[in-house]
């Protein structure tokens, strides 16, 4: 028997020769892979060899390298094998490899499932550190003692000790900081993870999410091993939890063995600080998903067949590579093995691009991105626009200089293999992970919210909790509050009537310095899927989507913009008036149809953009001109303005009493006491929970009484204008009233829209129209200002001027041509009102449209 310091020889008997790391497994045997593996191990009559760890060995020699990267030494034929074999990723997580069943099955038919998120564990050799060259029979005498000595090569992970420590953690850990609101249905005085295993038995989802902070507080050494060697430790955790589970629930049959998913690693880093020391370690980073790829099938196990003798072999993937057998194991023919695709094993894979969150970005820096790879059931768990905390293993992959040459570049390409997603953001409305989706609120919290909804002034309370640092503007805050709640989405496409949007769009316009941008920022920081853009800094493709070449597949793919990323959220657009025409034109379809049609570079599709738009615009003269209409002040097309449900004006009143109250409020913000700040935080927490609960559970429908009230309100609005020849309401205004009434019913946590909701919707809509759709000449509300860009009074005056000009030209007799300036002075002399040059040119254009005259230069010719 060779000593530990001796260099093993490549020649000699089978007992002393190391087995290659990726030994193909023959399909000829009728036993399961784990049974075949034990049979191969038991065929050797050699002794257990210790790994050469002495400094006297030349580690650079080929013989030493052969040992360092070889399979574990083989045992005596009479040896009883261990309960687990770390060298194969297909067997870890199986409570006992001796259990009879189908090939690759666990306990009572629960199959074993490979974990591509961890990669292959074949390089994790089993090493007996305490062996001193004794006979194998002495080791076989105590299987228990052999298990205690098993350590994974290259680490300090003692498999038996690690497994025992994790089992003790599962059976004993009680979270001292647990709150009932966060652990609905969990007894916080009992071991937390044993109750989670009970849930797995009931629900049947074979995934156990383990908080790394809990492991650290229970066993710091176990936590250190998990962070440093996740690829080796997590399979050991899988084995431990499966043994406990199937001992506790022997009759349970799961889809596959339970997989442990650690999250909340305290080694949380900003993605721009990731460096080589993090490679192959467990990390947690946060960011926003900006792109997800299509599903990619990834081969996990290749099936090869000899073209000469039909001998078959399976080869497992090892760190993204599959070693094709060069020689047939039966007939020894070289290069005769062919890959059989339909017998190979594949797993789902998805590439995700994660971008740094704006709040984590240093000043003056552009956002960093990192590539994630999700596997199996984690595919399609997140969508573009989601803010997530990702726990995974940081990988570095070499890049070949040439695909045909094995030489690689010195710079490696990095990515993260995802182990756990957690959708969360503490500042926003509600952060959910997969455990909390179904049980967001405890019964006590729901009862508190329902009790709050019964208060008669709940509407005013919630509005005052919204942006408390901004003075007054109560109606504007109420409008934004209703926008946060939203209406009820209705889909009648199966009857041919299409879909009706539930999102409410609001435009804030007025003087500079009236808190418009602050309101937008407040809403952006509150909603879970919000996007914030500025008019000048946004392009049409930045809002919609643009085509780029995928660096992985080299194919053209669609990269989504702000409107698509804020699907089911709110898109805040500041400096709305400064957007160019091509950028604003893309909003027409989004604001009404809630979709985005794309036809670029051969990619034709329709994306969902079910987003509410909250926009802010300044007047073109830097100050609001009360003598002009809204459209004349902000120079926005009427086709776009008509799509806003509410248009509010924020004007500077220039009143001394108001200025004094405002200054007192602003100064008070600077010496706010801790009690006041804490009270505001409590109000914010209640507001978040209230809106989240209403969103997820309340879907109000119109009652008969509310339907009649809406009909009467619409008819009354039409009557107001018809008496003066004006249009004061269109069907879009009726739809806006319905959405506002539904949102107000959600504020009351009512599933039925009552007349009181319609009354508030009418009042708020009327207040907004008073400000934005009032004709400055007459002081009367005229909705046609927003829908056609011109009030009825202006239209009537334009028609009268054109008629007067026509009479003036006819009174001059049959004159073939008239001078432009002379005609302008004549009409000004006859008119009682001041006629500007623009009004005169509009009248000429109206007559030209009627084929009465034509204007050539400075000459007017009759037709």
Curated annotation (Swiss-Prot):
N-acetylserine PTM positions read: 2
**Which InterPro entries does its entry note?**
MCM, MCM_4, MCM_CS, MCM_dom, MCM_lid, MCM_N, MCM_OB, NA-bd_OB-fold
Q: What is its EC number?
A: 3.6.4.12
Name the keywords, alphabetized.
Answer: Acetylation, ATP-binding, Cell cycle, Chromosome, DNA replication, DNA-binding, Helicase, Hydrolase, Isopeptide bond, Nucleotide-binding, Nucleus, Phosphoprotein, Ubl conjugation
Major enzyme class: hydrolase
Give the disease association: Immunodeficiency 54: An autosomal recessive disorder characterized by severe intra- and extrauterine growth retardation, microcephaly, decreased numbers of natural killer cells, and recurrent viral infections, most often affecting the respiratory tract and leading to respiratory failure. Affected individuals also have adrenal insufficiency requiring corticosteroid replacement therapy and may have an increased susceptibility to cancer.
User: Mind telling me what this protein is named?
Assistant: DNA replication licensing factor MCM4
């Amino acid at each position: 028997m060779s000593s530990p310091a001796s260099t093993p020889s490549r020649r000699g008997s089978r007992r002393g020769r190391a087995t290659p790391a990726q030994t193909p497994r023959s399909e000829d045997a009728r036993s399961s892979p784990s049974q075949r593996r034990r049979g191969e191990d038991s065929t050797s009559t050699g002794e257990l060899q210790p790994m050469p760890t002495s400094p006297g060995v030349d580690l650079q020699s080929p013989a030493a390298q052969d040992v360092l990267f070889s399979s574990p030494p083989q045992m005596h034929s009479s040896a009883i094998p261990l309960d687990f074999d770390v060298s194969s990723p297909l067997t870890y997580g199986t409570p006992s490899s001796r259990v009879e069943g189908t090939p690759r099955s666990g306990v009572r038919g629960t199959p074993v499932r490979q974990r591509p998120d961890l990669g292959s564990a074949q390089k994790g050799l089993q090493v007996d550190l305490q062996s001193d060259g004794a006979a194998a029979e002495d080791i076989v005498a105590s299987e228990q003692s052999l298990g205690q000595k098993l350590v994974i090569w290259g680490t300090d992970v003692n498999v038996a000790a690690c497994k025992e420590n994790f089992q003790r953690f599962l059976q004993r850990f009680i979270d001292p900081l647990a709150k009932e609101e966060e652990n609905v249905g969990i007894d916080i005085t009992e071991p937390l993870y044993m109750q989670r295993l009970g849930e797995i038995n009931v629900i049947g989802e074979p995934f156990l999410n383990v908080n790394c902070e809990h492991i650290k507080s229970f066993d710091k050494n176990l936590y250190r091993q998990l962070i440093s060697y996740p690829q080796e430790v997590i399979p050991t955790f899988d084995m431990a939890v499966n043994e406990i589970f199937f001992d506790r629930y022997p009759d349970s049959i799961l889809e596959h063995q339970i997989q442990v998913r650690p999250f909340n690693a305290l080694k949380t880093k900003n993605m721009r600080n990731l460096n080589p020391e993090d490679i192959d370690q467990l990390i947690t980073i946060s960011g926003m998903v900006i792109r997800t790829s299509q599903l990619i099938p990834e081969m996990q196990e290749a099936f090869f067949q000899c073209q000469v003798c039909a001998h078959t072999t399976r080869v497992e993937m090892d760190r993204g590579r599959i070693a094709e057998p060069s020689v047939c194991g039966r007939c020894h023919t070289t290069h005769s093995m062919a890959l059989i695709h339909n017998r190979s094993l594949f797993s789902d894979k998805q590439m995700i691009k994660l971008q740094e969150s704006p709040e984590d970005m240093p000043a003056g820096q552009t956002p960093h991105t990192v590539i994630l790879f999700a596997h199996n059931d984690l595919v399609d768990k997140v969508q573009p626009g989601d803010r997530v905390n990702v726990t995974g293993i940081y990988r570095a992959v070499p890049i070949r200089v040439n695909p045909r040459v094995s030489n690689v570049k010195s710079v490696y390409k990095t990515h993260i293999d995802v182990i756990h997603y957690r959708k969360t953001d503490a500042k926003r409305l509600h952060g959910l992970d997969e455990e909390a989706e179904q049980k967001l609120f405890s019964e006590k919290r729901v009862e508190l919210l329902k009790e709050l909804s019964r208060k008669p002034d709940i509407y005013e309370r919630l509005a005052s909790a919204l942006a408390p640092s901004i003075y007054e503007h109560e109606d504007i805050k109420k409008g934004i509050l209703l926008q946060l709640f939203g209406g009820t989405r209705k889909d009648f496409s199966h009857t041919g009537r299409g879909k009706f949007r539930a999102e409410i769009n609001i435009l804030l316009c007025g003087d500079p310095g009236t808190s418009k941008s602050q309101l937008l920022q407040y809403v952006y920081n509150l909603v879970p899927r919000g996007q914030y853009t500025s008019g000048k800094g946004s392009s049409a493709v930045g809002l919609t989507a643009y085509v780029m070449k995928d660096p992985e597949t080299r194919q053209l793919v669609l990269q989504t913009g702000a409107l698509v990323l804020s699907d089911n959220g709110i898109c805040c657009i500041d400096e709305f008036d400064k957007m160019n025409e091509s950028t604003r034109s893309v909003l027409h379809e989004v604001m009404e149809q809630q979709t985005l049609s794309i036809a670029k570079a051969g990619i034709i599709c329709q994306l969902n953009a079910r987003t509410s738009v909250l926009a802010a615009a300044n007047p073109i003269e830097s100050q609001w001109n009360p003598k002009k209409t809204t459209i004349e002040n902000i120079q926005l097309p009427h086709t776009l303005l008509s799509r806003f449900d509410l248009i509010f004006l924020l004007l500077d009143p220039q009143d001394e009493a108001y200025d004094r109250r405002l200054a007192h409020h602003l100064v008070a913000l600077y010496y706010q006491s801790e009690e006041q700040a804490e009270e505001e935080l409590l109000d914010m927490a209640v507001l978040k929970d209230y809106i989240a609960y209403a969103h997820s559970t309340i879907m109000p429908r119109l009652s008969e009484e509310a339907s009649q009230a809406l009909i009467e309100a619409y008819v009354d609005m039409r009557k107001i204008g018809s008496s003066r020849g004006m249009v004061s309401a269109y069907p879009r205004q009726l739809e806006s009233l319905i959405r506002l009434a539904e949102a107000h019913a959600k504020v009351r946590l009512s599933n039925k829209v009552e007349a009181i909701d319609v009354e508030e919707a009418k009042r708020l809509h009327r207040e907004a129209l008073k400000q934005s759709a009032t004709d400055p000449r007459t002081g009367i509300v005229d909705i046609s200002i927003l829908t056609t860009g011109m009030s009825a009074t202006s239209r009537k005056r334009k028609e009268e001027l054109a008629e007067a000009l026509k009479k003036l030209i006819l009174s001059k007799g049959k004159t073939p041509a008239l001078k432009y300036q002379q005609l302008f002075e004549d009409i000004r002399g006859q008119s009682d009102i001041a006629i500007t040059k623009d009004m005169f040119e509009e009248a000429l254009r109206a007559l030209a449209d009627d084929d009465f005259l034509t204007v050539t230069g400075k000459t007017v010719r009759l037709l």
